Amino acid sequence: MNLALHTLSLAGSETLNDGFAATLLAGGCQLVDVRSPDDFMRDALPGALNLPVEVLSYDFRHLDKHEPVIVYGAHPVACVRAARLLAGQGFSRIYHLAFLRM
């Protein structure tokens, strides 16, 4: 599985360089898995929090607004929706992770 990290903006997303993505994934970020609890239990990324979009819309207290957040899940639309919810709550460094299957 290949990974691509994108930054969210209202205009779209931008692919980040591999070095920056590696730095974030190595521990300088908060990982939010927006999939169902069952999917999360099956194969979550290490250190990720399970906050499905339905939960994230009212409960984001486990996240620090001052730290970068990477949102990932099975569906890009859910990731973008979650990222926009976080942006609306004052989070500014929000990224979404795209899983590219080859």
Where are these predicted regions, by residue range?
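Catalytic cysteine-centered active loop of the rhodanese-like fold, especially the PTP/DSP P-loop
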Residues: F60-M102
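Short loop/helix-cap segments at secondary-structure boundaries that form the rim of catalytic
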Residues: F40-P46, F60-L63
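Flexible, polar/low-complexity N-terminal or interdomain linker segments that lie immediately upstream
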Residues: M1-R42
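Alpha-helical scaffolding within the catalytic cores
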Residues: V55-Y58
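Short, conserved active-site loop motifs that form the nucleotide-linked donor/cofactor pocket
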Residues: C29, A48, I94
